[in-house]
């Protein structure tokens, strides 16, 4: 039998054969035979070997098709069932759970053979399930010991004894495995499994730490013990899959990491050169001189108000930097314990990494701007937008793409399983028929087919349309490709076995004379298969059959007919949509009641809320009881929502009973009330979707969550073990010096115990790592470098990889639920929607009745105006003519009328309507009486038929007359209006600027008949009916003048100059707003000028509006959204001109004036349109987030309201709770009791607090206040309420991670949907054709360039050869890297010797690069300046020379610009390294994605700037007089436009918005109402919250969406077989073979040229026969054109595809247009024909030589015979018969 075929498998015990010495001998024999076959020459064409079977993979469970394992063979060596291992020295072992283990049959450790008793015992132990459970239990207990054991006592005896025990267990486990498997040499040995490497390292380190007399520190070594937690991953195979996916994503991240590191290095160098030594500028007292020890001279430094921090200053600020008695000087102190600075490359790099991760970057931003000047903001803009937004989101893009690739594999796998399912179904059907024919009982198979292979059960294999990384199959979560134990029981594996079994049980096996035993085994096989299928089916059922019977017996109440009647009535009522609507209204009102709770409620109000709670609880309990009665408990509890409702109702009932009986409420029970809010999800699809996403993600992300928990656990324990002793809750004296009872030296964030260490790691995952790292470094002393390593590792591994995969999965979950929700929404509506539909239908009925009455009245009013002519003729006039006429009419008549004769038959109109078209229509739809106006004349009956449009298959209705009116005076296209006398409301304006509605596509020809560019009607159609005075005839005086005026206005407003002028005025008026800052009051002349310009601008806008009214008409003007926006802004501008006190507040709204730019600038218009398309979805998600957050708000109010107060003294320090315990003591002791500005006193405040927590800004103060809170109006105590941490952790996971990422999901999803609507140009091409098309598109734009000619001068030629060589480039790039390293070595206050060395090095580099420039100019001559890179190099060299000269000047004060700018010039040299990018394909893809994104990002940037501009103007109007406090100071404020923009740029990333809001949230008590400093907290909150939502959540997420989209596009392009660079390199090689750029090379040079090309275009030698296949066309002189060669080589790389010839012809035509040179040369032969000619010539030559040899040897007579004989070689050739020589027949001339 062929080795590749599967053996016949019958499910009985004979499958399991013990592994004996005979088995080993048989394997050795097979291996020897295989080796012989390999040596044999006959077997060189190797037969493909079988692959390992997935269902028999190690660690999977053995499929039940193989039968039960004999008890005596459990744990014993068996012959391998997988044919793949037939020729491998291996055996398999099965345990009781049928798990497969494989071992090598060679000697373990060179001693123990496969039959050794010690090894057999080790094998039995290692495969036993109890052994695995014991090891997992040990790992868990060990983790608990590590987590609970405090770091302070890590060397205690108890801990050491426990560690010895655990180490002993791990050593025992390793020894057992080594004895069973061998160590490393053989297959399946111990160290061949990478997971065992981890065990070895942990054990090795543990042993080393116990060696006596060892001198190294034990603590870092023992910290490695924590990695034992990873053993859980090695035991649970599902976790291995997730870790594998993570590792794959890390592989893909390599390019991003390299690019990020490179960019960070560049930014760090620029920052170092710009800001070196600037952050140590402080205000020092003029009395203090020579401060050597800053700590001793603390009094010499000026401090910030109410802060212990030193005041920073900048020399650029002059005298205003410090107070009068202080001056600005350099010191030895940098901010944040000296860790924030740019003094050397290391600290600068750390600062840039902090900027990129956006952790407290606003502090660095404020410090740098204060010390170096406001121009530094441009540096931060570049780093934030390029470094932070782009590079960080590239990480997300790469992880998302890696995940989507996995998705595609999953989809393919599911599709394959589905196909296999169908095949198995068919095979089993055939098998059943075959077995029945042989007399096997049909009943054994009937159940299999009927119970299992049904369409319903097919769903168990997963829905292939649903692409999810984790398959949600029947409520069970299973990752694809999983190696888990449960996976092998899934049906796909069964089906694989089924298929194989069916093949083995084919009819051939069961002939009449077959073995009866074989027939019995076949029956056994099918029966076991049936049983297995049934077991699988039962495993999917919700409960056992006995449970189902009991439930149907006792939980379905059908007592008596009367009871059934009651049930029927109740079911009708309870399932009615109105009942559901009533319950939903109750839920909403109940939610409002819950949200109304607040601090300091009045007794009556509280009583009302309690009564309300009782009422709603009663309603919900009654609903539950009635539904249970109506539906029976059996059916009621089968729905998830009903179970949820019943739980909430019963908990509420328990809470009420507890209050009634015990007169007090339990917080635990009361908090469950808020779950009622989630009942809204039943009737609100979006909320339902969100809950589904969270549910699916929590389930589907189970494995990932476990991995994340393990990672957090490991880092928490590592932090606790390494830093727990020093970095604990008590601050060290150098950080805190308690001078009194008000100063606390306790810290909330530390690593002193596991819980707090976990919180620190969680905080790092939230994005805040730098502050804890500073404190850790300060406390750890010698281990400070370890702090940096650990904290950055947590940031990179945790935040950038794991959380990004989490987000990627969540986004995919969102898009899937969104699509599924849309499909379900189309299919069925919720009951609330059905109830609302009833109301809508009732309202529509009332409205239509009223409209009908109005139209009836209108028609009565208009009837006298219509005159009828006797004779029963139809209406006919010179103004109204029939649209459809008989074909028999002459063409002249038709031309006169100007109407086409034919109308498409597709018009969907009733046959009894008459369609009329007026030639010239009035400005409204009223028809005028009189001879000259429209008259209705009745046509004779026969002719009337010609005017009617007939439509088949329509039932005739009552006679109606309709007319189609074409507005001949519309602006662009005609208005086609159907007038139905019965239904005037159906008048439809078909074509307008705002909307286009095609009436049955048949009127596509109408616009061609209509004059263009004319105004539309002034008033809406139908207006003249109600107001006859507005009816005008524009053909009669004086309305002709009005019509001409309108046409003139129309031409004006449509003129490009008018639009340009308006844009100019908008820009000027917006610019004027900039000057209205806080200093305007002191500048009356500027104020007067601004008032004048404001009046002028307002009048210009009014004039523009009036012109547009006249030109467009009111109908068109007010139906355009952009025009409405302009109108609102003009009205606001007009109100500002009126000097009324009441209207003064409207002046602020002038800030909206720049919005007019939106309608004028196309780039922003595109972005806004995309944004408007997403607004409904964004608002929906925003509303869902608000509801979701409401639950946490209500809980927050319940837990923390009134508890955020504290007692402070005169210096704003909190007094210790042991001195003052409550508010009354505080006030009696003449202290101040203040409440924190952001608190949980009511739901509104709670929303603000949660927004700060969700954006991680200002959240520390809120968490501190919460965890320190005791009771209402009690003094806070340090961490008295530690459970408060849990509240915030849960909110961050569900309220921040889930809900805020939904914004990204919504925007990306909408963005993709709009892309699909706009795209689709490639939908008619196959994938192969797309590839070919892309390649052709790239090469079509290329053509050969003429290379730079080598100089004739020998010296110049030598230099030319040097500078054009690759080695020269490598040397120069190496020097650039060395120059970069030398710049990195610079530092602030470096030793003079070091400074001298670096200066000299700089001179050396300047000289080298100058020489390089001169040498290249000498060698390349004028061609040097034709290359962009050369020009860049030249400019850099010139600037370097200038900067180096200026830096040598002693007196640099007179230079008009800062000398630091010249330092930056040197950095431009680094830009030359970008040449290397060409070699790095992955990085090139990333940069290409950036280049593709730039246009879109520029538009988004413009929109963001516009939003910032408007908010800056609003901020200047509202907050210009806020006193300096918290984040508001002399630089960052809203006093001027520049300072406002600085603040808004900062908070566009949500950074520090809490500190800017804080000064504006003054309480009424601390605010003087007469002061201008008082502001409404509501306005300030709305201002900042709206800006955060618009900029941070929407615009910045659009930025992310663009990057993701373009990264995907760039990746697709980079994955194309041929890229731009391949074509560039082709032409570079071409230049060497075609120096004159003729576009042709000789055929003889083709072989060398093809071999010289790099892959994939290269055709390696020998390649002549491959050219034959290509059939290349040649022109005269045996030349080939470059395009022909490139086409042929491209087709060879891409392979064959349909339609390539037509595409090639199209691309060649384009190339011809671009390169007319090829037209001059027509091909005369091809390479194939030329080769045939060459072979023919060679044969002739050979024959001729043969003939000549015979001539010389033979005599003359023989020679005559040869010449004249009929079969002479020469004669044969002359006859043209070359077939005997292997050449195609052709004519050979012998003349």
UniProtKB/Swiss-Prot annotation:
> Where does the record place its I repeats?
115-408
**Membrane topology recorded in Swiss-Prot or TrEMBL:** Multi-pass membrane protein
- Residue ranges annotated as intramembrane: 345-369, 754-774, 1244-1265, 1537-1559
Extracellular side of membrane: 149-156, 213-219, 270-344, 370-376, 597-607, 660-667, 726-753, 775-785, 1075-1088, 1139, 1203-1243, 1266-1281, 1386-1396, 1451-1461, 1523-1536, 1560-1579
| Catalysed conversion reaction | Na(+)(in) = Na(+)(out)
**Keywords carried by this UniProt record:** Cell membrane, Disease variant, Disulfide bond, Glycoprotein, Ion channel, Ion transport, Membrane, Neurodegeneration, Neuropathy, Phosphoprotein, Repeat, Sodium, Sodium channel, Sodium transport, Transmembrane, Transmembrane helix, Transport, Voltage-gated channel
Keyword Iron found = no
**Cellular localisation:** Cell membrane
Name the GO cellular-component terms: axon; axonal growth cone; C-fiber; extracellular exosome; neuronal cell body; plasma membrane; voltage-gated sodium channel complex
Concerning Pfam families, the annotation shows: Ion_trans, IQ_SCN5A_C, Na_trans_assoc
> Among its keywords, does the record have Transport?
yes
Q: Give, from the UniProt record, the effect of changing residue 811 to P.
A: In HSAN7; increased voltage-gated sodium channel activity; results in excessive channel activity at resting voltages; causes sustained depolarization of nociceptors and impaired generation of action potentials; causes aberrant synaptic transmission; causes transient hyperexcitability of dorsal root ganglion neurons
Activity regulation, short description: Activity is not sensitive to inhibition by tetrodotoxin.
Q: Which cysteines are joined by disulfide bonds?
A: 283-322, 776-787
Its GO biological process terms?
action potential initiation; acute inflammatory response; artery development; axonogenesis; behavioral response to acetic acid induced pain; behavioral response to formalin induced pain; calcitonin gene-related peptide receptor signaling pathway; calcium ion transmembrane transport
Residue positions with a glycan: 290, 338, 781, 1209, 1216, 1222, 1230, 1568
| Illness association | Neuropathy, hereditary sensory and autonomic, 7: A form of hereditary sensory and autonomic neuropathy, a genetically and clinically heterogeneous group of disorders characterized by degeneration of dorsal root and autonomic ganglion cells, and by sensory and/or autonomic abnormalities. HSAN7 is characterized by congenital inability to experience pain resulting in self-mutilations, slow-healing wounds, and multiple painless fractures. mild muscle weakness, delayed motor development, slightly reduced motor and sensory nerve conduction velocities, hyperhidrosis and gastrointestinal dysfunction.
What this protein is reported to do is described as: Sodium channel mediating the voltage-dependent sodium ion permeability of excitable membranes. Assuming opened or closed conformations in response to the voltage difference across the membrane, the protein forms a sodium-selective channel through which sodium ions may pass in accordance with their electrochemical gradient. Involved in membrane depolarization during action potential in nociceptors which function as key relay stations for the electrical transmission of pain signals from the periphery to the central nervous system. Also involved in rapid BDNF-evoked neuronal depolarization.
About its domains, the entry says: The sequence contains 4 internal repeats, each with 5 hydrophobic segments (S1, S2, S3, S5, S6) and one positively charged segment (S4). Segments S4 are probably the voltage-sensors and are characterized by a series of positively charged amino acids at every third position.
The protein here is known as: Sodium channel protein type 11 subunit alpha
Q: Which gene encodes it?
A: SCN11A
